[in-house]
Amino acid sequence: MKYIILIASLVIAFKASYADECIPTPHRTTGTHYEPVTIQKDNVSKGLVVRGQVLSMPDCQPVSAAKLAHWQAGEDGRYSDKLRAYLFTDDTGQFKFESEWPNLRPPHIHFIVTAEGYETLETQWLGTNRQNEIEFIMVLEVKGPE
């Protein structure tokens, strides 16, 4: 059930961003296979292009230099250090990396997104049918007063 809610929330955030009304991406657990991601790479494997954009709430503006740490299980259904890396968004808040299809049920990729002035986002992309390319938007919340 929680996976269905996340997919629906990501779709809502994606559609809302084009309506100039950003909804923050929901937070999801880092899972049991989290380990600190220490390698910066644009490509960790081949077969799946992952691209998207990081925007700010509530104005839907691109967030440049956001750090996206990602990890996932591979085609064999196992988590591996080779599929853990981080990268940064460009000046337009966009990111792109290549990986392999996450062969778990449901297929998913974990993300931790950090950017100066924004709350840290821990979330997951969830898929259904095998694809060669996926694209989505993540919306960050501005940090409140501490």
Regions found by a protein language model. Name each.
Residues 14-19:
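Sec/Tat signal peptide C-region and signal peptidase I cleavage site
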Residues 20-146:
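Beta-strand-dominated extracellular/periplasmic modules and repeats
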Residues 4-13:
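Sec-dependent N-terminal signal peptides
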